[in-house]
UniProtKB/Swiss-Prot annotation:
It catalyses: ATP + H2O + 4 H(+)(in) = ADP + phosphate + 5 H(+)(out). It comes from Staphylococcus epidermidis (strain ATCC 35984 / DSM 28319 / BCRC 17069 / CCUG 31568 / BM 3577 / RP62A). Its EC number is 7.1.2.2. This is ATP synthase subunit beta. CDD domains: ATP-synt_F1_beta_C, ATP-synt_F1_beta_N, F1-ATPase_beta_CD. The gene is atpD. HAMAP family: ATP_synth_beta_bact. It is found in: Cell membrane. The keyword Cell membrane applies. It is an enzyme of class 7 (translocase).
Amino acid sequence: MGIGRVTQVMGPVIDVRFEHNEVPEINNALHIEVPKEDGALQLTLEVALQLGDDVVRTIAMDSTDGVQRGMEVKDTGRDISVPVGDVTLGRVFNVLGETIDLDEKIDDSVRRDPIHRQAPGFDELSTKVEILETGIKVVDLLAPYIKGGKIGLFGGAGVGKTVLIQELINNIAQEHGGISVFAGVGERTREGNDLYYEMSDSGVIKKTAMVFGQMNEPPGARMRVALSGLTMAEYFRDEEGQDVLLFIDNIFRFTQAGSEVSALLGRMPSAVGYQPTLATEMGQLQERISSTNKGSVTSIQAVFVPADDYTDPAPATTFAHLDSTTNLERKLTEMGIYPAVDPLASTSRALEPSVVGQEHYDVAREVQSTLQKYRELQDIIAILGMDELSDEDKQTVERARRIQFFLSQNFHVAEQFTGQKGSYVPVKTTVADFRDILDGKYDHIPEDAFRLVGSMEDVIEKAKDMGVEV
């Protein structure tokens, strides 16, 4: 346990000099007692570089206000570690595993695991492919999620990534009753606060651990909070054999924080100003999220797409690790279609007959080809109008519009804003309903009846309310 002294403070980066034989290892946690008006505050640093001359460069996990040159720094001799196990359920933590929910503190005797760990070996990995039903039609039909897989929700600012994540937490907790870990990485504190109270009201919080490093926190906390959440999830997988859900909102902020830290550490930036270690950092996080022979971690990650540019290195690097992608499209939000999932751009490794069954696969591909044909005809419609289309094309367009509207639905978590009841639609019902639309069974029902509903029964009810004979 070495003692060092602060030699330099550059925002969230602090240099510390130790005695010759006491230089701490990379990733070790160091502590500084920072004097405050109401007593001393313990600031945690993480060693990032060994500069030579017995100096290490560290990243602060909290504000460095009040830190001065010459202050004493203690080496803890180990990584940052967080509490794990059932004590974490129903609680809210920061990056260091300290509770921030105004409830009683967690006992020091509770088991704590380090946040830096090796990914599971090849011989431990499970290769079974099983579908995770979400109750969201567009997801279950066209880009189904895999149990123990990695799922990305891609979209620009304000297209509904967080709302979709909240609905998934709600549906999976209510229908499947599994344990969830939510890591809020560099997002709005208000959203985290709302999510906590919503989950408390619905009772879901009892099976959820929450870890936050939000927008207002230093880059060190935002860069490490995803690892803190993952460590809690790994315990439930490895020690208790559970199938755990890990929600990360937002994985782009993990990369963004890494970029800020990289620049402060003096590394040469790579493409678009990102850190040169972007692929390595992402790989170290993503490879730990996997299914093993003991249990599984299914991760659902919101991915902010800067300026809606999917070729940006941050979303492009994330793409490489995912099994399913759900792409949110701004044009659909403008049309009032929620969730604004692009049915043609969203993909899933699980959409094949051997996994979902032949009927589901055929319906999904037919829905996509109908929507693709409609997209191709849109230019002709814009220039010449519907009258110039052949009867077959007119029928395709009308069915495609019904499909497009029927892919929308009301969410439970949005009830307070919309005043409409949310709906959970089982996969079997979804496949059967879309088969009927494709077969022309509901061509006589006006397309407005298909907007923001659950199953076909809701469409028929809505059509009756509109005065249509069904």
